[in-house]
Structure formats: structure tokens, C-alpha cells
Amino acid sequence: MAKIYNENKNVLDAAFERIEFAFNEFDSIFLSVSGGKDSSIMMQLTARKARELGKKFSILYIDLEAQYKATIDHVKVLIDECSDVLEDVYWCCLPLSLRNAVSVIQPKWICWDKKDKAKWVRNMPTGKYKKYVINEDNYPKEWDWFERGMEFEDFILYFADWFNKKHGGLTGTGVGIRSDESLNRFRTIISDKKVRYKGKPWTTQVKFK
């Protein structure tokens, strides 16, 4: 039995309701996918609703290089299973600055750093997935905001702004968060200080200059 969202609705129905709202409200949609359980479920549910409504969406996958093979394999499966409703896939293998939890000498490191290619944990995707890869050598010329070593959090915001300008109109983006997994995630959802889209408590409205 599905988990009860409230006395009249379970979480699955509530999720489909929110996804349909997004498709009806926004001119373009992209999902931020990590290959983890939350964003994977979000992507699969969005694909089901997209087929029902005759819609398409894009995904942003930021590949941080030092990731489990099982995660990479799972992302490939997600892309294959949802390919019929995917507009664009942005598989980013870019030199971003990341926190390093295994060293007190080097608190940060840069993934996919070309000068350290001999030390890469793994190679970039090949075969049929190579066409999705965006790296330091082929990123769009419009990305004049991109800099080697930029912060992960900054990249996401710049990407969202670029994606919106590319498509025009209103853009919606999906992020898989389970509010009962951590206090910070719960506070992110229920915060009354953020600007919400049309008053929906599970949304955050962002405007770029």
C-alpha cells in the first residue's frame, strides 16, 4: 500500500499531481538528476506523466568523476528507459571545485581536471552516451560564465539561467528531496522565508537579473 500523504491522498498520487502541475505551468522543464534514489524516482515518475500528457523534459547530470560504477550504470539505464520523453541530456563532465573529505592538506579538489588526467578515477562516458557529454573542450559557446574550478552550487544557478534563456518563457526544474531524510532538507521545504511559486509550499521561485 502506498504511503498516505494526507487522509485523502497517497504520496504517489500527490507526486503525479505536482508533476502535472509543472508540465501545465512551465514552458520548459529540466530535472537535476544525481543517480540517487530520490532523483531517480522523480525522473521515472516524470517520464510516466510526460507520456500521458505528450510532453518532454530535459535532464542535467553533473558527473563528479569519483562516482561508483553502479551509479553511472544506473544513470545510463534511466536515460535509456526515458529516452522517448527526453528532449536533451546534459551529462556534464566539467572541472568543478569540490569538497575533499579525505584530506586535511587539500580541502578541495577539481574533478575532471585535464592537468591531472593521469589520476582520473575513471574515463568519461563513451559509446552511445558520448554524445551527451559536455566537457571542458566542447561546452556551448554561450557558456561564457563557465570557469575552470567554479563551485558546484554556482554552476547549477548559471546553468538554470542559460537553460531558461535558451528556451524562453518560464522554466521549471525538479530536484529530488525527501524532507524526512534530514532536518536541513525538511527546513528547505517548509521555510516561510523563501519565495514560492503560486503559493505552492513545495516550490521555490528564483528570478535571475
Residue ranges and their predicted role:
Residues 1-209:
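ATP-dependent adenylation/nucleotidyltransferase module used to activate substrates
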